[in-house]
Amino acid sequence: MKDFQYPDDIYTEAEPDENTLANLGPLAPMAGIWEGKRGLDINPKAEGAVKDPYIEYYELQPIDAQTNGPQLYYGLRYHTHIVQPGEVETFHDQVGYWLWEPATGNISLSLSIPRGQSLIATGNAAADAKEFTLKAVRGSLTNGIISNPFLEQSFTTESYEITVKIHEDGTWSYDQ
């Protein structure tokens, strides 16, 4: 995340452009509905880690520009729904926002899962970047992780990292 000195006037709203897609920077190629069939989950069990393949459905829709006084974000609202091959029951569900701040090059990912965990991961990239990494760490006030009491006690998440790669064929992938 790149530091940025915002104006002293924190009340005057930034002037957004109506064309969100043209202002998404490195997030623009991610907009749309995607399906991935090569996922592998590593799940902790008492007898050791279990590896499960999965199919992921990922939808990213442009949202109107968002302002916090002089701060201006363009973004994508997303939902990812994951099932195991041949199953209909949800294996993992996640919602949130991918946000791009053109003035700084900062990218934020806010995510929440219905098992009681949320985070904000942050990073920085050029508008035309084909790869970028976002990170969150437990205890941070700006890119942190918060969990329900059971997860905090039994399965503490110390950090989160995701690297996104935009491919020449118009697709994208991530590693976390």
Regions found by a protein language model. Name each.
Residues 1-75, 156-159:
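Amphipathic/hydrophobic helical signal segments and adjacent flexible N-terminal regions
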Residues 36-43, 77-83, 135-143, 175-176:
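Generic short beta-strand segments
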Residues 31-33, 72-77, 104-109, 129-133, ...:
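Short, hydrophobic/aromatic-rich segments at coil-to-beta transitions
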